[in-house]
Amino acid sequence: MIKRKIWCNLCIDLVAFTSEIFKGAVFQSLDGIVVSANCKLRKIFTLKSKPQDTADKDAVYGVPFSTDEPTDIIPRSCQLMTDVPHVTQLLNMTKLRQTEIKFGGHPLRSAESDQFINRGTSITRNSKNQDVCHIAFGSKVLGPPPLSGRRNNMKISSETVRSVGSKNNRSCQPSTVEKCVNGTEMSALLIPESEEQGNKENIHQIKQTVPIHAANLHIMHPHPPQEPSADKNNNRRRLRLKSTSRERTETPSGSSSGNNRIEDKASTILTTVSQQGAELLNSGTLGPQSPDQSDEWIFPENADHISYLASSRQSLLLGDDSCNPSHLWLEASKESEHDQQAEESQSVPKDIFTFSSRPRSAPHGKTQTMSPEELSFILDLKEDNSVTSRDTQSEDDFYGGDSSEEGNHSIQGSRGPTTGPSELTQLTLESLLGKAAKRTSKEYLRSAYTEAGATESQDSSMEQIDRNNFEMSLLPTTCLSPTGRRCGSCQKTPEPVIKAKDLSAQQVPASLNKTSLKEISGERLSSIPEASEYDWRNYQPSQMSESELQMLASLRWQQNEELEDAGTSHGLSASQVDNCNVSISTSSDDTTTWNSCLPPPVNQGRHYQKEMNPPSPSNPRDWLNMLSPPIVPPSQQPAEQRPDSCESLSVQGEEDLSVEEDEEVLTLLYDPCLNCYFDPQTGKYYELV
């Protein structure tokens, strides 16, 4: 009835619907609008009067449009462009009744509908509570409220079978078949496919008379599931609407996202005229019902066919631990073959849409307990031979995105040729490895994940190499002396604060006066015994996880900050650090000089923001605020050092600022192995006087 595949200005007469649905009520205001159509929505606006209907009124409704009533013009801001094909369609009770007459049924008068509504409730009424009303779903209903919400004992006449669409999905018990007026006819309510979503909101209901032999009629009403789910608000049924040209996925109104549990019982949308395992009525003839038929609802749009519901056996549940993957695979293949044969054997008319409920994946929270073989079935559980892979949408994709038909395609929703369990397992493992690699460091774990099929020895060697590279990236580049000699005093001096592996992080150039230094003779250097070069890799644990490496890195940062807070600052501001042209390199042949004779800037307060930033390992200039030689407590100093050497180190930065220009200043590098200073320009060694 609603125009499809074209932009439509759908105008709904709220005044007419209000007065028809709620007797004696007058429309005043609109509280909210719920749109559940599978279409593109552009704008929602209100008009005081109805606009001119430009749809095919003579062909569709049979009665020409009356022009004596006042009309309104759609505002310019809400009008569509002139080059866009569109129609304006008015929807009121008059149009609905004309549509019922056109499709073979007589319109139901308001008096008859009141009689049918009140007949079921008048049985339970007596003289005491004759005028008692209660509120049901926001509307006032005559009669006392039901005894309990789970069992609603409303007796409904067989002449009018009403389907109640509500958020609770409550259903009525089976009503007994009474004798009709003429004995061979009953009035069944059919909801046509309307407004692109099958009219899930039940805005209007079309009543239609269908001739049926009453003797062969078995009426079954839908029941709620026997086992209530954990969360009532999380029930969601997925309905797939199949036609001859395309497929679209729909969800009933009132259901919220979440629980994807498969319910084998029928929902409360349609009147059913079949009995489970008994008889199936179609156009007055009975046919055998297949026990393996999968949840299919056929909605006819003409009076020649009667809607039926074939309730099937319980569908596949992936969350069931008792299911064997091989059995699941066999059952899925059998069901796909059976569905293909059933679709070929059924002669479905052109205007009939079939709703089928496919097997769905388990809830997201339960997939941790599955094996990889069971996880593989989430990717592609069942092949759908009736539609192309382009029109298929997965369930998760439908929940997460919008409900348009064009766009949303994911890996799970794409249907292809049937693959074996081994190939699916391989795909699942690759996807799991890909997800895990994204969570961790890409450079650190890339080789370990690409070599997943190699032996354990190869894996262990790869991980060890990666850990070494990872730890090397945490440390700044160092500058050592050309010789790897170690003096005896360095080995004897206990330094509990600074560890050996942290000394490389402390090596920065320092500017010292030549008068405060004493050159070390070559004989003393030659007398120092040769020591093997220190390799920090030999002293690392063999097996360390990524979290432990990160913990060690954070400990190094914390230790460096503690050293900086302990008084080892060189006394330079951030502006003076920026003015120096010193670069730290791994070679000791660097010829850069330290220009520390610059006067202090006038305004040093504006650089406090730079001083607050922590040093980054990528920028060597950030490491210049840490002084090279470690401060040793006086109780732990060697005997040859004077007690005031610690004080000379602490005030060294202030002395550098007051150095006169005629004094010679040397740029030296501190060597922790030799416990002395090295001049890269002259190649000489110095120690403090």
From Swiss-Prot:
Residues 584-593 have a biased composition (Low complexity). It comes from Homo sapiens (Human). Residues 394-405 have a biased composition (Acidic residues). It comes from the Eukaryota. The gene is CFAP20DC. Disulfide bonds: none annotated. Residues 241-263, 333-423, 584-659 are annotated as: Disordered. This is Protein CFAP20DC. Residues 251-260, 343-359, 409-421 have a biased composition (Polar residues). InterPro entries: CFA20/CFAP20DC (IPR040441), CFA20_dom (IPR007714).
